């Protein structure tokens, strides 16, 4: 907890002690549920703080995050990065999405129990949710830590972002080749040139894609197609 609290204070998070405590309660709840439903492979508390909490908060240092009020998290799993961001930035609204109904119910329930009111978690595949008018071309920012190739992840995520908004993908240290291969897909989906920003944490990278035009109606393709036939 001390490491998490130090990090929150380092980045001038208001009410850092309270938010650090809330996140630690969230961790305990996730780990308890994890014995019944697969929410995370990380069960060591120090590693959880490093790889789930601090890692999730890396994008908050960016101007793009600061300027955003509506944020969606695609493939949230156990609530990452969406829940840590929502806890630390209660003035922003978060929509979290996951394809497994059990995970959605659990994350919703834990957030409700802890009083995290700026989070909504919905069940569905990104390819289908992005076809719904209430979600399409709507968000200032889309974030995702989902394990998927950038060509696939862009088709999942960019349709949710409004023109002028940003998509941020959490990636590993050596993602240049993957991002180069995704340039055509990003352009097709209304995005501009991807920008890789290195972080000081765990050698991770954040890939920023600004969206300059609405995503064409043809995308995303039907559920399962993006993964099988990447753009």
For each of these PLM feature ranges, what is it?
Residues 180-231:
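SAM/dcSAM-binding transferase cores
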Residues 30, 85, 171, 209:
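Residue-level signal for inorganic ion chemistry
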Residues 164-174:
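Conserved beta-strand signature within the Rossmann-like core of class I S-adenosyl-L-methionine
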Residues 2-67, 72, 102-105, 109-119:
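Class I SAM-dependent transferase core
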Residues 103-105, 175, 179:
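Short alpha-helix immediately C-terminal to the canonical SAM-binding loop
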Residues 89, 161-163:
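Helix-to-beta-strand junctions that scaffold the AdoMet/dcAdoMet cofactor pocket
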Residues 57-148, 154:
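Conserved SAM/SAH cofactor-binding pocket of Class I
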